[in-house]
Amino acid sequence: FDDDFGQWTSPFIMAAINTRVVRRSNALLGFPWGKDFRYDEATLNASRYQAIRNSVAGGVGLVALALGPTRALAQRLLPKPGEGPSREQREAGYYEVFFRGIDPSDRRRDTVLKVRGDLDPGYGSTARMLGEAAVCLAKDELAVGGGFWTPASALDGKYLERLTAKAGLIFEILES
């Protein structure tokens, strides 16, 4: 249960990657959020039952994909590359992500941010984000040289501008 959002949570499948990218961005940018910065992601659920169901289903799915026989079965049953949602489904999709920034020294400074995307998150919106990152790399003068950078640390504010202008993302501060 997440006390800040007042909802039950379950693991978010992309958290294993996203959390590392966010923490690396903090380090590459010189720790603007502090060296004690913490970041985590979870899926908000409507009820305790839904949180338990989603957690169990995700765990069973991961175990099944780790075992040879069930992985082979899953490969036969799950969609193949290129067999994802239809164009209509991608265009009808959307998502909302809520972030809560917590200032442990003064909780009155906590901030809630909502990000909304106007397409399916797994296909449409991700493709737009990748496309706008490519435009930044091709057209903008970057403040960084070669190496392994995160989008936030290499693409600066131009990327955020492109995401809101051309990729269908809306960033909104709800509480501050």
Report the location of each language-model feature.
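C-terminal catalytic/substrate-binding lobe primarily of soluble NAD(P)-dependent oxidoreductases
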Residues: F1-S176
